[in-house]
């Protein structure tokens, strides 16, 4: 049977230990901070990146160069292995499109998947992908199963700082100023892989109650398998979430990590990404 190799980028919020233990090859994004370049999770950690945001420094994220994908695909596929390359949403970054272009330029057998997600929403797809590969499932069937899995995943983002949305052009300076004065915390979700702002909360507690309501509607009669929380230096907010969700949904399995710079660069210090995987 042909060997299958998994490739992804640095935005899944899965631990380095998990990625290494499962032989997942990571092609990282790049970060620019006040003009200086860094390789995500290599030259700088998520925690260190958030410190720069707290200091209101100019930060940007960049997709990997096409040459990095070409080199990786050629090396990994030279023995005839199949490569399954899964990446953050094409609605959030050009990474998927670059990976796909690279796959068309090499002799290796590469299948590129748009996860239409990020953070633990991408991470849960990778974890499922790992199990499917271990079971010997064909690549074409894996693509179908991941498409089905995405229907059972919901991602919410609670914005930490409106300044980052202003810099990114998602809201006007006037709306941002008013929002900051009123201490509004916008909440967004992914719609076909694109971030859409859907609600404005005034306090942490009101944001938690909104999330609880939306999660209950999403899961319906199903149980929750896992909740992933990626936060930008607000562990006390995470603790509040867990307390409310434990009472409401009897959740036993949480995955918690500091959020990927691709999210925190746009949502600011104090943000969280909340991912729900239902059974």
Swiss-Prot record:
The record's disulfide annotation reads: none
Q: Do the record's keywords include Secreted? A: no
Instruction: Tell me where in this chain the DegV domain is found.
Output: 4-278
Which Pfam families does its entry note? Answer: DegV
At the top level, the lineage of the source is Bacteria
KW Ribonucleoprotein (keyword) present: no
Protein residues bound to hexadecanoate: 61, 93
Q: Which residues cross the membrane?
A: none
Which InterPro entries does this UniProt record tie to the protein?
DegV, DegV_C, DegV_domain_contain
Q: A GO molecular-function term, please?
A: lipid binding
Report keywords, A-Z. Answer: Lipid-binding
Q: What does this protein do?
A: May bind long-chain fatty acids, such as palmitate, and may play a role in lipid transport or fatty acid metabolism.
Protein name listed in UniProt: DegV domain-containing protein SAV1425
């Amino acid at each position: 049977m042909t060997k299958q190799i998994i490739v992804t980028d640095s935005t899944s919020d899965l631990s380095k230990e998990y990625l290494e233990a499962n032989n997942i090859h990571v092609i990282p994004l790049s970060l620019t901070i006040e003009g200086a370049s860094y390789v995500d999770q290599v030259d700088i950690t998520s925690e260190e990146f958030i410190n720069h945001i707290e200091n209101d420094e100019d930060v940007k994220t960049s997709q990997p160069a096409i040459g990095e994908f070409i080199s990786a695909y050629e090396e990994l596929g030279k023995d005839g292995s199949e490569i399954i390359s899964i990446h953050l949403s094409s609605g959030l970054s050009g990474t998927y499109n670059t990976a796909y272009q690279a796959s068309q330029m090499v002799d290796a057998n590469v299948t590129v998947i748009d996860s239409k997600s990020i953070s633990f929403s991408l991470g849960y797809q990778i974890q499922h992908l790992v199990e499917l590969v271990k079971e010997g499932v064909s690549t074409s069937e894996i693509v179908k199963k991941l498409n089905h899995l995405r229907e059972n995943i919901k991602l919410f983002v609670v914005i930490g700082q409106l300044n980052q949305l202003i810099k990114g052009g998602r809201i006007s300076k006037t709306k941002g100023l008013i929002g900051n004065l009123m201490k509004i915390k916008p909440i967004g979700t992914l719609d076909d892989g694109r971030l859409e702002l859907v609600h404005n909360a005034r306090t942490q507690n009101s944001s938690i109650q909104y999330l609880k309501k939306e999660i209950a509607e999403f899961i319906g009669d199903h149980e929750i398998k896992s909740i992933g929380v990626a936060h930008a230096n607000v562990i006390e907010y995470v603790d509040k979430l867990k307390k409310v969700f434990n009472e409401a949904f009897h959740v036993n399995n949480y995955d918690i990590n500091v959020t990927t710079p691709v999210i925190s660069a746009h949502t600011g210090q104090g943000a969280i990404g909340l991912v729900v995987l239902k059974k």
